[in-house]
Amino acid sequence: MAGLRRPQSGAYRRTAAAVNLLLGVFQVLLSCCRPGGAQGQAFEPLPNVVELWQAEEGELLLPTQGDSEEDMEEPSQEQSFSDKLFIGKGLHFQPSVLDFGIQFLGHPAAKLLYAYNPSRESEVVVNSVFTAARHFHVPPVHCRVIPAMGKASFRVIFLPTEEGSIESSLFINTSSHGVFSYHVSGVGTRRVSTEGSAEQLPNAYFLLPQVQSIQLSQTQAETTNTSLLRVQLECSLHNKVCQQLKSCSLGSDDALHLEMNIIVAVENSSKQPEENTQALLDHLSIVYVATDESDTSDESAVNMYVLHSGNSLIWIQDIHHFSQKNVLSLQFEPVLLSTSTTNFTKIASFTCKAGTSCDSGIMGLRKKKASPAMQACLSSPVVQGYFRTDASTAQFHIESHETATGVWSIWYRSHFDQSIVLKDVFVSKETKHILKVLSFRGPLFLPPGCWNIFSLKLAVKGIVLNLFTNVFLTTNTGAIFAIPLQIFSAPTKEGSLGFEVLAHCGMHYFMGKSKTENPNWERSLSLDRSTWDMDSELANKLYERWKKYKSGDACRRNVLGMSQFAFTKKSKETEPFVSFLPRVVPEPNLVLNFSATALRNSAVKYFVVRNPTPQPVSLQLLPLSLYPRPEAAVRLLHKWFGTDMQMVNLSTGEFQLTQACPYQGEPSEESSLGALHVHLQALETRRVGVVFTPADYGKVTSLILIRNNLTVVDMVGVEGFGAQELLKVGGRLPGAGGSLRFKVPESTLMDCHRQLKDSKQILSITKNFKVENIGPLPITVTSLKINGYNCQGYGFEVLDCHPFSLSPNTSRDISIVFTPDFTSSWVIRELTLVTAADLEFHFTLNVTLPHHMLPLCAEVVPGPSWEESFWRLTVFFVSLSLLGVILIAFQQAQYILMEFMKTRQRQNGSSSSQQNGDPVAMISSHPHKSTCKNFLDTYSPSDKGRGKSCLPVGPSLSRLQNAAKRSPATYGHSQKKHKCSFYYSKQKPSASAASSANVTTEEKQTVTLASSLSVAKEDICTNVLSENWVSLRYASGINGSLQKNLTLPKNVLHKEESSLKNTVVTNTPSECSMKEGVHTYMFPKETDSKISENVAELKEQEPCPQKTSKKPPESTLPKTPPQYLQSDLPEVSRKHGNKQQAPVRSEVDSFEPVRAADAEPSSVRKTQGASPEDTCSEKQDTPSAEQEDPSRKRKLQERREGSTQALNWNKTRPCRRNKKRASAQASSSPRPSEQSEQRLVCSDVRSWCAQDGAGEKCKAGTEVSGSSPERREEDSYYQKSEKKCADKFCSDSSSDCGSSSGSVRASRGSWGSWSSSSSDCDRRPVVDIQHFLPPGDGVSPQNFPSEASVPLSLPQHVCSSTDVSVLPEFTESPCPGLPATPAGAGEEKGLYPPGGLWPSQPVCLTSSFNCPVENGAPGVSQEPTSIPDSSFIDWSASCEGQFPSVYCPLELNDYNAFPEENMNYTNGFPCSSKVQTDFIGHSTPSTWNTPASMPAAWGHASLVNSPSYLTSTRSLSPMSGLFGSIWAPQSEVYETCCPISPATEHATHMENQVMCKEYYLGFNPFRAYMNLDIWTSTANRNANFPLSRDSSYCGNM
């Protein structure tokens, strides 16, 4: 070989990876001295991170993760610590900061640093530990393993060499987590001498000897259980340690061997000697501290320090050294080492005497020839915090030898401030068979200066070299120096064989074609169709050249990649084409084999690509699946490299490429298509990673194509295996079949028999299961869950429940405890094992218990701790609730009792006053109500037969005032509220029947009308539907003007007086006499026989003769009454439209206060001033009307003005009645309060009779015989109109219903239920017009003219007839029916508002109701009713006909639907003189004188004794009244209700029906009202009493 070729300056610069060094104090200069210059590269400082850039010829490397010696032998100049820096904090250090405190200069101190590995899965390998300052030292650490969840200790030694505070960093280089930095600090101080001056310390150096062996004495090795051990410790210090000492010169092969005899006191003599010696080594630390020559001495000293941290006592007896030359002097004294973990003890000192210089040995190694000498010079100026390399001083000089072996000596010049130890020198793996390291026999102590380190020898001959590799040097600082080395051969001269062979091969010529010579290569990088065309063309050219050169035997290549010179005379050897090609992959036939990898996980492996030529090379790396024609590429590779085409997967995408770590500032060349572009400079190496991510289970094999412009194509094989984690628990696989059984035999539960209940011991069953990893992957179980709960749930608990790891084919036992609650004999739960890869393995826990042992063992199982408290709280709260209910019930009952007592006291007080017979004594602020009460007292016993709902009549004034303060609707209703009972009387002849009150004076019609309204308040009790019912008939001379006048306001009535006089047939007093001397007495049905006798006595006192007409008079009805009504109704409707009806009703409503105001004085005067003898005289009535005082008139005017506001509201309140309550209310008996209202209405009717009927003869029976077909048409019309009117009512509040206080009457229909008054509103059929004849309170039959028709517009509270055409007027029937007005048109408005005249509740009586005539009076016609279309109503048919259970309230707008002319009062009224004066005391001359010839309508003899007709669902129990009336709400206004049905049949006698209107002041929903009447009267309990006990409601509250 002619010599070495030096690369051009700056042509082959290489960069290295970064090194993490904080506060570094080293600067490494690796110089390679060559003729022509030197190359190097500087280190750039970074805060806390120091990057080390590798130089071409010399660089500093630190071992990184997974870098073994083989890894470092790879020619990778990119391997730097920046690849692994700060990957993650994988170690925890304790203490967090290491502080040594104050230490004397030159005196070492030690402390332990503990490193913990928190990972539960992987272990951590510590490759090396080094420091950044010369004051801190760590004994050599090489590949120390820290197990998972384990710890390791490192001894850090602090040797201060300068004063002051010293802070530095300790660097721990790990295999998996990079480099960690750890802060250390200390303070150095000088030792003060006895003279008081500080000692001057020369430069000190820290040396660590190697302990070679430790031996026991022969006797102790054979003796056991000894307490003392004699140990011989042999350690060596390399001879080159003394080379720094100027006075010491040792041979190159000499070493300083020391032997220490140590006696150790053993604490535990039972241990083996080997264990004791190992413990001694672990706790014994030996260091050397060498010092330079001092000013006073030429000798250098090496002090020996020993640290013992164990518990045993150590006695150092002797120390010997074995040096071949007597150059060392030893000073030693035996010492007993104390136990300490920090301070060293100085035990010996060595002094090195003067010797020869070191330069002579070096000069002897130099060669005499002029070939370049090889020197190694390292300079290291310390710069705090970072490294810096001076390129001008970092040089390597390689000396060539003349011998064929080719040996090169490596020289090293160190400029460090302190010495370093060179531990090892090695070369990369690929060059082991080429290069050999010589002259290196172990660790070298390298003080500052220039030293011959080792030699390199080329082990091959006769080949052309083109080699680029590294030489690696390891030091005690933890740093590894990589020296780049390029070795290649060249012809010694032109024309030599080697040069010619290389030129004829033409490899460099071909490989040099890149961008300029072959531009198509760059276009083929797009991986389109042209890619394969380009690769195929270049590959064919290269192959043809190889065949050409091969046939000429010009050049051959071996498997090592180096050409061997051969002569043509030698035999030809067959070599493959691949051996001829220079490979970009250093390792031929390289296959990256990935171990088993879990799905969705990735594994990475790296390989190296290099450029073996001095020309740049461009590479494109890509998986085979991304190549345009992968099958063609595989065929080419099979042809060149012998690849197995069957095993290669052409389409797999599980392999991807990644660049290992791009250089800082250099952009990544990875393309978006998954290919990797790499540009390699001459001799450059790059590291490329392959990522394997399995997509399915199983093995997959593919190729990584390496397209290049050097050999066209190259490849790397890849192989991976997709695996899954698989566990077995208890020998069962997870899933449906993974059932882990807990079979509990009966013998296990026998303790339930012997166990006491008080002990409450918990039975549990424990079973162990083996968890096996049967898969190829390691598994880490992170959690165990039972039905979603960690470690325990539903009685199961996993003991020692913490994460654990399982390697493949390993197992572990887990214990599961089951605590049954003995509620079920079969318990099934799910055990889930969750791994670190988020995989879940499900197993079934199946427990079977003996079912017959469950009840016995369940008693032993203790309940939850909160169970007893829960039940106590439950019982406590239930008790409180029960107590509260009892208290509330007690208070309510007490309130009910108090209300009952109040009501009873009021009733008793009123009853006592009524029994005295003085009606004036009961007059209260409401005279008409008091009069109603007096009337009850007259005809009733002391308790008045009231049942459950009998309330006091007189309301309190406060209630009236409160009612007036309500809303306008309530106020309008609270103005007038009346209650009426209905009474039935039998006709008896009386002397007072001849008295006549017929006043026909035309000038007093208006006065009579006004006074009649006042008198009606007193007479209403006997007015509305009393027992003295009279017949109604229509006059034949009806005209429409009269009816219109009655419907108009008062001023209209005054204007039409003349027309009324001309139209109405007047009755003269002479003509108002009856043909028969029959007098009709009105008795309520509640009265007994004693009352009837009193009436008989009154009858004898009445002088009025009575005559009974035996022939019914002809009817005077018009021929066509339906046409008249149909024509009249629209006319009135047009006159009184929606806007005109309100004033009319308001004016009509104004009559009501007049009645209320005038009732009291008139009642008093009539009662006191009239005698029984003059009751029939009409002159007695006239002055009573004239006695009205002015104050009474003023009250009349005020009440007219005050009551108008309630009219409009009542007008718009139609009400529906619930049909279920209708029958019950229809069958309820009349009440005393209703009788009072009847009396009020009586006077009104008499007043109207006196005005309109003056001058006419009242002849009885004139209107029954006049029945005609036109009359029947009229009757049918009325029946139709009633059906049409049924749709007029709507729902309203209970105040508009026909029952009082929430329908006390309606409550009788159901036992103990609430009143249905509010729902009764839905039951009212439409009866727009109801005309009635209010019976007089003692008016004789002579008051009614027998020949004249009495026109009357009746109020709303009289039951209307269903069929008007069947109203009988004569009393030929055994018991005449009750008179009523037919239902008329629904559009007409009446005179009285709903608050004025309160209608009564209808009561249907039995058909057997008879009206006997006492004393044989001829008042009863013996002829049966032969006229079917009579004017009497069949009331029993009304009750049970078309609407048997429906109320029929009378509307305000229905009063004037029928003309008053058509109404004839043919029945006689009771002519009691005392009572008659109440009706006619102060009114105008009455026209109520009935002719003597008028037949009596109520002449049946069985009036009192006949049982009542009670049809409905009323309860007969007295308790029904209690439950039905206790909570009766107070209603405001109640409408009249009457069941309406067409009269289909007409019996020989008439059935009676009564309507009652109850009165209540107002409804207060927040107060309970109790209406009770306990039956205490014996008379009321009599079996002959006609009505039931709950039918005599009276009074209000």
From Swiss-Prot:
GO CC annotation terms, alphabetical? cytoplasm; endoplasmic reticulum; plasma membrane
Q: Which residues are glycosylated?
A: N343, N593, N709, N846
A Gene Ontology biological process term = Wnt signaling pathway
Q: Where is this region: Required for Wnt-signaling inhibition and LRP6 degradation?
A: 696-916
Extracellular side of the membrane: what ranges? 41-869
**Topology with regard to the membrane?**
Single-pass type I membrane protein
Basic and acidic residues compositional bias: what residue ranges?
1269-1290
Signal peptide range = 1-40
Q: Which UniProt keywords apply?
A: Cell membrane, Cytoplasm, Endoplasmic reticulum, Glycoprotein, Membrane, Signal, Transmembrane, Transmembrane helix, Wnt signaling pathway
Recorded family membership:
Belongs to the TMEM131 family.
Q: What does this protein do?
A: In its membrane-associated form, antagonizes canonical Wnt signaling by triggering lysosome-dependent degradation of Wnt-activated LRP6. Regulates thymocyte proliferation.
Q: Please identify the protein, giving its name as recorded.
A: Transmembrane protein 131-like
- Organism annotation: Mus musculus (Mouse)
